[in-house]
Every structure is written in C-alpha cells, then in structure tokens.
Amino acid sequence: MSLLTEVETHTRSGWECRCNDSSDPLVIAASIIGILHLILWILDRLFFKCIYRRLKYGLKRGPSTEGVPESMREEYQQEKQSAVDVDDGHFVNIELE
C-alpha cells in the first residue's frame, strides 16, 4: 500500500460531515446568507449594465430648465443623450421630459 492511500484513508474518516440534520442556528443562518449571496451575485452579473447605468445616470436629475431658451434646452438634452448613450450593442431607454 502506498503512502498516498494511507494518508487518504486516514484523513477521510476524520473529515466526515457531521451537520446533515443539524438544527444549529449558526449553520442555518450561514446557509441562508450563502444562498442569498449567490442569488444576488447571479442577478448582479446578469443585469450589471442596467443596474449601474440606472444608478449613475437615472437617479441624477439635471438642473431646472425654467427660464432657459428652447435652443439651450435642446442643446442640454443632446449633451445629456450623448453622455448616457454608449454604443456597446445594448439599447438605452432615455425618458425626456
């Protein structure tokens, strides 16, 4: 018998899973946190472009345009459009007031 199989056999009995039917609150909390973390990570990877663009550009409101001539409003809207519109194969929904 080689030394490798002896070591594997020896450690295998020492690392048995003892938490199959465990009702320890710490084990349950760790499992729930792990599952939630996995779900949030998957959602983040699927929708990261939408989420971060919305946070970066969607929540910012521009300055008030009251009393500003129409030509300057259009220029501001065009600048805002060019700042948000990124050509990477995805469409960006922009709602103009």
UniProtKB/Swiss-Prot annotation:
Other remarks on this protein: When the channel is activated, one or more imidazole moieties of His-37 probably become bi-protonated.
Keyword annotations: Disulfide bond, Glycoprotein, Host cell membrane, Host membrane, Host-virus interaction, Hydrogen ion transport, Inhibition of host autophagy by virus, Ion channel, Ion transport, Lipoprotein, Membrane, Palmitate, Phosphoprotein, Signal-anchor, Transmembrane, Transmembrane helix, Transport, Viral ion channel, Virion
Subunit structure: Homotetramer; composed of two disulfide-linked dimers held together by non-covalent interactions. May interact with matrix protein 1.
Pfam families recorded: Flu_M2 (PF00599)
Positions where lipid (S-palmitoyl cysteine) attaches: C50
Sugar attachment sites: N20
Record PTM Phosphoserine, positions in chain: S64, S82
Annotated Gene3D superfamilies: 6.10.250.1640
GO process annotations (BP): protein complex oligomerization; symbiont genome entry into host cell via pore formation in plasma membrane; symbiont-mediated suppression of host autophagy
Role description: Forms a proton-selective ion channel that is necessary for the efficient release of the viral genome during virus entry. After attaching to the cell surface, the virion enters the cell by endocytosis. Acidification of the endosome triggers M2 ion channel activity.
Transmembrane segment boundaries: 23-43
Residues under site feature: Essential for channel activity, possibly by being protonated during channel activation, and by forming the channel gate and the selective filter: H37
Places the protein is found: Virion membrane; Host apical cell membrane
An example Gene Ontology CC term for this record: virion membrane
Topology of this chain in the membrane: Single-pass type III membrane protein
Protein name, as recorded: Matrix protein 2
Topological domain ranges for the Intravirion compartment: 44-97
Region (Disordered): 60-84
Family according to the record: Belongs to the influenza viruses matrix protein M2 family.
Positions in the Virion surface compartment: 1-22
Single GO term (MF): monoatomic ion channel activity
Entry comment, domain topic: Cytoplasmic tail plays an important role in virion assembly and morphogenesis.
Site (Seems to be involved in pH gating): W41
Regulation of its function: The M2 protein from most influenza A strains is inhibited by amantadine and rimantadine, resulting in viral uncoating incapacity. Emergence of amantadine-resistant variants is usually rapid.
